[in-house]
């Protein structure tokens, strides 16, 4: 093939308790050291032989994908429907996200444009905090964002994976911006 896209995640950079714990990270940001970062790093290393064969390799580091058809957004909608919505954890963690339509268009651009090579962060240009996200979701649904989901509740529901629900990344789409990608959904609103 002319191009190989290896689907990775922004977990590559590690997870942080709150947005102020890190600066914005583009594709040149350092590797993280937590478990999820190690998985992403190993996953990306496994794809590197494709480049040695002369194939254009893109390591697509995707953030939280928003869609009403599934995933995090759908899980957050249910509590808000019953006036029980609010931020997960402290609410101060960063949420580097992308709308499903932008994710699809990003992949199409990568397939069609040879300027994309190496790491590409598939995230919207403006990371938000979990508090911002919950407030915006409440506004869209006409519901208050009052009831935070405590870390303990997340741990009971998710077990070991809870750490990644109450922490976040502050990533930006450096490669997409450089190549003029047009986001349909650049901000939460």
Placement of each model-derived feature along the sequence:
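Conserved Rossmann-fold NAD(P)-dependent oxidoreductase catalytic core, especially the SDR/UDP-sugar
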Residues: 1-34
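Glycine/proline-rich active-site loop of Rossmann-fold NAD(P)-dependent oxidoreductases
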Residues: 17, 53-55, 66-75, 110-120
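Active-site Tyr-X1-5-Lys
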Residues: 30-60
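Glycine-rich "substrate-gating" loop/helix at the edge of Rossmann-like oxidoreductase active sites
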Residues: 32-36, 63-70, 90-100
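Alpha-helical substrate-binding/gating segment
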Residues: 77-85, 93-127
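Mid/C-terminal beta-alpha module of Rossmann-like enzyme folds, strongest
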Residues: 110-160
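C-terminal amphipathic/interface module of NAD(P)-dependent oxidoreductases
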Residues: 163-189
């Amino acid at each position: 093939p002319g191009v190989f896209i290896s689907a990775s995640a922004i977990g590559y950079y590690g997870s942080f308790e709150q947005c102020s714990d890190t600066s914005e990270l583009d594709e040149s940001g350092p590797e993280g050291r937590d478990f999820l970062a190690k998985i992403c790093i190993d996953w990306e290393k496994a794809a590197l032989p494709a480049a040695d064969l002369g194939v254009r390799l893109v390591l697509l580091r995707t953030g939280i994908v928003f869609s009403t058809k599934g995933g995090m957004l759908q899980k957050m909608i249910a509590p808000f429907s019953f006036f029980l919505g609010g931020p997960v954890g402290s609410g101060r963690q960063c949420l580097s996200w992308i709308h499903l339509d932008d994710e699809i268009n990003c992949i199409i651009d990568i397939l069609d444009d040879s300027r994309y090579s190496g790491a590409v962060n598939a995230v919207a240009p403006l990371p938000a905090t979990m508090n911002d996200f919950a407030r915006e979701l409440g506004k869209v649904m006409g519901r208050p964002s009052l009831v935070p989901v405590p870390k303990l509740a997340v741990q009971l529901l998710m077990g070991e994976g809870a750490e990644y629900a109450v922490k976040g990344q502050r990533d930006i789409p450096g490669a997409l911006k450089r190549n003029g990608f047009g986001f349909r959904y650049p901000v939460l609103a």
